[in-house]
Amino acid sequence: MGAMAKPDCIITCDSKNLTIKTESTLKTTQFSGTLGEKFEENTADGRRTQTVCNFTDGALVQHQEWDGKESTITRKLKDGKLVVERVMNHVACTRIYEKAQ
């Protein structure tokens, strides 16, 4: 069911303050932090992670650590679409968002 949800992803950044909000019919999550500084994030699946976000090579890179594990989420614009790649333990998945009209 969750894989079929078509969420909206709203990213705002003013100076160094970043907010990412993901809204779907199933759930809405949001986190905020300062670029380059670690902060605690409560993820949609209930994990409490230590997260740091930075802009690297034109992409927004979000690195999460929890319970001895880590994952990286990279968001970049490509051909007018938001491409989100998630990597954990050398396994990657990609989700593509189209801009709302």
Curated annotation (Swiss-Prot):
The keyword Transport applies. It comes from Homo sapiens. Forms a beta-barrel structure that accommodates the hydrophobic ligand in its interior. The lineage of its organism: Eukaryota, Metazoa, Chordata, Craniata, Vertebrata. Pfam families: Lipocalin. It comes from the Eukaryota. Keywords: Lipid-binding, Transport. One of its GO terms (molecular function) is fatty acid binding. High specificity for fatty acids. Belongs to the calycin superfamily. Fatty-acid binding protein (FABP) family. InterPro entries: Calycin (IPR012674), Fatty_acid-bd (IPR000463), ILBP (IPR031259), Lipocln_cytosolic_FA-bd_dom (IPR000566). One of its GO terms (biological process) is fatty acid transport. GO terms for cellular component: cytosol; nucleus. Signal peptide: none annotated. The gene is FABP5P3. The keyword Nucleotidyltransferase does not apply. This is Putative fatty acid-binding protein 5-like protein 3.
